[in-house]
UniProtKB/Swiss-Prot annotation:
Gene3D superfamilies: Homeodomain-like (1.10.10.60). It is found in: Nucleus. Residues 1-65, 114-157, 212-325 are annotated as: Disordered. GO terms for biological process: brain development; regulation of DNA-templated transcription; regulation of nervous system development; regulation of transcription by RNA polymerase II. Residues 114-128, 308-317 have a biased composition (Low complexity). This is Homeobox protein unplugged.
Amino acid sequence: MERPALLQNGEIGTMESPTTRLASKPFPKPFSIESLIANQTPATATPPSPPEERDQEQEAEQEQELSARAMVASSALGLTQFPLYNPWLHGYFAQNHERLTHLIAGGCYLPSSPAGHPAAQQPQAQAQPQPPPPHPPTHALEKQLPPTLPHPLDTRFLPFNPAAAGVAPTDLSYRRLAELMNQDYVHSLSVHARLQHMAAAGRMHEDQANPGMAQLQEPTPPQAHSSPAKSGSHSPMEPALDVGMDEDFECSGDSCSDISLTMSPRNYNGEMDKSRNGAYTNSDSEDCSDDEGAQSRHEGGGMGGKDSQGNGSSSNSKSRRRRTAFTSEQLLELEREFHAKKYLSLTERSQIATSLKLSEVQVKIWFQNRRAKWKRVKAGLTSHGLGRNGTTSGTKIVVPIPVHVNRFAVRSQHQQLEKMCLSGPKPDLRKKLSAEAIGGFEKFSGSTNASSPSGGPVGLGVGVGVGVGVGLGVSTPLSLARSIY
């Protein structure tokens, strides 16, 4: 007699344990694993109950399951940005999360048949207690409720609201949503592509759910059936077509065209060739000195512009300029002009170029190289402490400078011709050299200039490739190798 009274009060189970009374409450305060275990163990120990009591137990379990899903959904909504996925892209994920929540709230992902929706299950549960419930709904509930356990990852990673949390995991649209969210390329798709993907997936699942209707619809509307097949076939290709075309990452046509033009391999190779040719054409020579760079640019921009324009096509076609082979006559004349004047004006350079049948650029480069060599010799003399007037004398004893053999022989011939035939400042230069040699090398001799006898021979011997030999007396002979630069 106590069981009907307990059933009228809404309590379930017997008076044996207080934990069974807690199971009758719709929303328990501490919802934990221990409470679930405590609720399930006495239910298994109780004897089989009538169908009405079983319906009430199922309603209570359904309410508990809905409350548990609501708690999981609220905790999942708190993690809108996924901290362990890509922390530097949280803004883009937040935008995708807002779009997906709008789509889910609008009902795009919900199924058309209200089989798993809680709002559709509650009226059925309220209408069932009057007649004895048939067994198929119980089997449907048993099929729906237990598979909630293998889907904790979906509820954790999918941002959905508690209204959509009641969807059963066995629903096809729910599984499709989980698959879409777990795929990597869903973040690179636009909203339009997602809607197309959703529509195609919904049509495919409807065809799978109703194969008879799909067979009836296949022969009659070929165009209407081709559109979902076309969209479904193109849906895997959507990421490749839609990457970079999202509204958040649009780029202007000019910038995209510039990037595509500059980064294409053909144009990249062309730019590299241009830069290399420009580097070779801008540099006049490989051994040009740095202090002559500004002057060479100024001179090249002056009257040398015509020759540079004339040789522009040939210099662009060739990667490197070949060395000019000067004749002996040209070298003699160039050496003579260099001894007379270290720097040339534009008019002098043009005159020398026309007389020697050379271009002004060749004359300019030869003078630059010659000045660089002259400065190296001067620096070597000053480091030895032997140069008094290095600009005019250029004296040295032994300075190992790599000089071409032909140029050295031509220079020695030029010195011989200059001493024997030419007139001008060179005899005075020879007198200066002899006087400076006598005064500058007194520390190497055993006596002073006064100690040399008045009748002592002071001879000037000219060697072929050696230079000038000076003998100071018979007792203190000293031979010096000199080359006039």
